[in-house]
Amino acid sequence: MIHSQKERRYRCKRCGRTFTETKDTAFYRMHKPRWLMLAVMTLLSYSCPVQAIVVAFDVDERTVARWQRESGSQCRRVHEHLVEAGKVALLQVQADEIRVKAVGGVFWLASAMEVRSRLWLGSVISQHRDGRLIGGLLIRVRACGPVEKILLVTDGLSSYSSQALKIFREALHTGKVGRPRLGLGTGVMIARVIKRYQRRRVVEVMRRVVTGSEAEVISRVIATQRSMLALINTAYIERLQATFRARLAPLVRRTRAGAHKHSTLEGGMWLVGSCYNLLWAHRSLGEERTPAMAAGLTDHRWSMEELLTFAVPPAELPRWRGRKPKWLLEAEDAA
């Protein structure tokens, strides 16, 4: 229900409260022209340093940082609504991490992608390269789709195998009384690519199958990469990481625009990742298709304005056994 056309406000028919048109979007409570924020976000997604934007548009650097954080939050909501809805066919998933040099510290950025559609499944940032980082990444991978027939290809970091064996487990129902035992499905496969370096050069590449048969792993790799000469590799995720380094200024190896805060790096990560999935056409997919189009998540190529103004529907109310709390009763009345 329209409340005010001049102020672009609406009134909810159920709760009776008014809200603005830009509620729960990146433009909420923004007092600058919309074109300015769209231009700034486009430049940030193409690795433009913040100081250059400050000089070009006469905008305070704190304003640019706040816009990047809000746009990153919007992109994260869109990613969780579209990609992590459980509809992606996870045939071959490659995962890897990169070292990010920040101001006064170091961050680790772990990412994963689906090879067949080139879809970015998400990333996790942490100060330590440990099992918690890898576990958070694999939790996002599992939210993207079923893992009954997944092939996970990683580098030599042992945390991937241990965390995958823990997170990809499912209940094995036997028909007996009691809680079913947790275990991996018969279609789950895990492979590792271990590279040995000497004087900063790769001198040997070892390929190992952790879970599953080698014949099934090779067959899956050939089917997803569409090449009879394909071997177990992490080339696709490494190419994606190169895209992130080229499109996000703080990820450049020798940069003067290093990130000072975790939130700045995370906001830029979600912005670039969502642009990669929804805005940028991938050359290997052909016909001006984006990875989200190849995965069947959308039928057109998005624009920056559509990404930042997309209204994500609210989450469903949780099921509650017993007496419901006050906040849940108020939410049910409003819904």
Where in the sequence are the language-model features?
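Residue-level recognition of single "structural anchor" positions
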Residues: 1-335
